[in-house]
Structures are given as C-alpha cells and as structure tokens.
C-alpha cells in the first residue's frame, strides 16, 4: 500500500511561524510519530512526504535519524492541501493502484488503524476513517442563532487516513482543477462526482494536533501508550 502524508501545515494556531510538524512531541518531531506508525504497519510499503522545499532538509535529517526500512520520498507540495495531494498523486510509482492519504498532524494514528484502512480498499473505491460524534451539534446562522439540530446518529467526525483507488481519485482531482473546486479533503471530490465514499471506524486518540491544548493531550496519550508498550519492541517502544 502506498501512503501519502501531507506535511506542509504551518503552526499559526500553535503560536509558531514554522511547520507545526517540526514541533516536538515526547522528544521527536510530530512527523516522526506518523512515520514510525507507517514503518510498523504491515500494509504500508511506500511513503511519500508532501511538504515545502524549505522543510526538506529537516525531513531528510529526521529520516536519517529514524533509519526506516521502507522507501520514503519527498514531494514538493502546493499552496493548498488540495494542490499538495494532487502533486503527491502525480509522484506515485506507476504500479500504485491504491493510496492512503494521512495528515501528518494526526501523529497518534496506530499501525493497526493504517492496516485496517488498507484492508478496506479491497472492498471500497473510497473511504474515510471517522468516529461517531458524541456532542450534540447545532446549526447556526451568521448571528449565532440556532437554526437546527441534526440527528447525531447520522453524524461522524472525519479523520484520516482517507483511502482511494488511484485512477478515480486522479480523475476527481483533474476535474476539480478544471472546475475550480476548492475542497478540504479528498472525499469531498469523490462526493462531488457522486462516487461512493464509506466510513471506516477510526480511533478516538487519532486527534489532529492543531492547538497547544491538542499537543498537551497528545503528550498524555503518547506517554500512556509508551508505558503500556515499554516491555515490547516496535512502534511506541
């Protein structure tokens, strides 16, 4: 399975002017934990890091430190996540038939989640890892007056990985560029073309590290995970 990792996000909500994936989590950059999960995944065989050129030396140093056994390539990103994933798709090896796309900021995803998602592509054209929404959601207007309350049983919070068959995803991206569509994830492109996208159950701990509070929570989760795995080898040891 081929894995693309968009890794160009800035840390403005972290109060930082640099790539947030360079921030440290338990002694390693955020991106390191994503890469270690991919390394420990049974299914992942190829990894593409999509980032800005200014970060390439940092990621090269990180890769030398981690000494991963799987091939990892650097792919120059675009101005938006959508453009970056498009560039990533063009850089896939010719034999790639399926792809997982996983945000580098979701650095607590486990190898088991990656494997479960890879297996889902035996059955689906496209899918999104997601978890059921726990909170009651309110729809509001521009004045913050509540307009409605959706049925919570039908609401899922989208995560990554998202996975797709490569050929239809490339077609979706090409049409999106032609039509000028701007979307926040790849599943939305599938949806615009009425292609089926399914849900694969994600992980509650698979949070996206965006704010200082997220980073603090991630530290606690990772510390517990490391303690639990302290007697084993592999991811998290």
Curated annotation (Swiss-Prot):
Catalyses which reaction(s): 2-C-methyl-D-erythritol 4-phosphate + CTP + H(+) = 4-CDP-2-C-methyl-D-erythritol + diphosphate
Q: Which GO terms describe its biological process?
A: isopentenyl diphosphate biosynthetic process, methylerythritol 4-phosphate pathway
Name one molecular function that GO assigns to this entry: 2-C-methyl-D-erythritol 4-phosphate cytidylyltransferase activity
Q: Which domain of life is it from?
A: Bacteria
Pfam families for this protein: IspD
Record site: Transition state stabilizer: 13, 20
- Which SUPFAM superfamilies has this protein been placed in? Nucleotide-diphospho-sugar transferases (SSF53448)
Instruction: Give the family this protein belongs to, as stated in its UniProt record.
Output: Belongs to the IspD/TarI cytidylyltransferase family. IspD subfamily.
Q: What is this protein called?
A: 2-C-methyl-D-erythritol 4-phosphate cytidylyltransferase
Originating organism: Acaryochloris marina (strain MBIC 11017)
Q: What is the lineage of its organism?
A: Bacteria, Bacillati, Cyanobacteriota, Cyanophyceae, Acaryochloridales
